[in-house]
Amino acid sequence: MIGRLRQLVDCESPSTSARHLEECASLIEPWLSSALHRPAEVTRVGENAHLVARAPDPRVLVLGHFDTVWPVGTVSDWPFSIDESVRIGRGPGIFDMKAGIVQALTAIESLPDPDRVSVLLTSDEEVGSATSRALIAELAQDAGAVVVCEPSADGGAVKVGRKGIANYVVEVTGRAAHAGLEPHLGVNASVELAHQIIRITGIGDSNRETSVVPTLASAGTTANTVPEFARVHVDARSWTITELERVDAAMHRLTAQLPGAVVDVVGGIERPPFEEAVARTLYAEAAAVAESLGIGPLAAVRSGGGSDGNLTAALGIPTLDGLGAVGGHPHAWNEHVLIDRMPERAALLGGLLARTTGRSRVR
C-alpha cells in the first residue's frame, strides 16, 4: 500500500491540467485492471480523462476521484513523506483522496470474485464534476448501490448525508461618475451591492442550518470614481432539496434597490443534497462489517461539504460516503493520513463490498 501511495501522491494531478490528469489515470489503470482481473479503461470526456471499469454483473459502484486542488510544482516542495514517529503520511492530495484510492484497490484485491464491482475514478470532482456527471449517473444506476471513497470524518466516521450546494454570482450595474465633482450623477454599484449582500444574508435560515454566504466581492475601477460595476459570489448550502430550491428562488428574485441600478443573478443548484435515508441500508451493512472486524462501533455523521455522492444519492440510489482514509486537513499544507489506519479501512471497504455483491441488489 505504501509504495502505491507514494507513487500516486507524487504523481501530480491538479484538476486544471489535462496532461497531468492523463498521467495519473495511466498510473492507476494497470493497478485497477489487475485488482479486478479485467481491463479498466481511460474514458475521455472533452479534455478530461476518467478511469472506468464496468462490471459484467454490477451490484455496487466504487466511486472516487484522482484530481486534486494542488497546482503543478507542489510536489517539488512537498513530496510524499511519512513521519515515522507518529506514523502520519503527508503530501498533496494524500487525504483527499489518493489514500482512499489505494485502500479501494486493496479492498477489491481481497474479493474472490470482483465481477459485480464497477469502479469510476473521475478527474474533475474538485471543480464541480461537469464532465463526469453523466458517467456517474450511468454507472450508479447500473450498479444500484454506491460506495464513495472520499475521506472519512473525524476519527474514521463514515458520511451518511451531505448538504446540497448552490453557487451564484450577483452582478450589479450602476453608472460611473466623478466621485468628487459629480457623485450625484452616478449610480453607485458598491452601495447597491451592499443592499444586496444584506438581503442575501437574510435568505439563510439558521434554524434549518441553511447557510447563504456572500464570499468573494469586488467593485469599482479607481478610487475617485463612483463604481459602475460590482459583484459578489454566494455559497449556499442546505440539508434538503426543498430548502435549496427555496434559496434558489429567493436568489433569482433579487431586484435593485437604487433607482437606475440593475441586478443580475447567475447560477443555481450544483450538487443536490445527499439526504440521510439513502444511506441507511449501506450504513447498517458497514456497521456490521466493522463489528465483525473488531473495529466497531462505526460512527456516522452528516457533512456540510459536497462530493459526487450527492449526485448518486439525489437519484435515490443507496449511497455511503466517507469510506476513504482517516486523517485531516484536506486542501491544506497539513493535509495528512494515519498510515496505520489504512489496512483496517481497506478491510472495512472489502467486507462491505463482499456483503453487497454477495446478495441481490441493495434496496
List each model region and its residues.
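Acidic/histidine-rich catalytic neighborhood of metal-dependent amide-processing enzymes
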Residues: 97-165, 205, 363
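Flexible, glycine/proline-enriched loop segments at strand-loop-helix junctions
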Residues: 91-95, 122-123, 179-187
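Active-site metal-coordination/substrate-binding segment of hydrolases
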Residues: 59-121, 333, 338, 344
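Acidic/His- and Gly-rich active-site-bordering loop/insert found
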Residues: 1-92
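Short glycine-aspartate micro-motif
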Residues: 61, 89, 96, 144-148, ...
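Metal-dependent amide/peptide-bond hydrolase catalytic core
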Residues: 13, 70, 151-152, 160, ...
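Short beta-strand segments
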Residues: 63-64, 120-122, 147-150, 171-173, ...
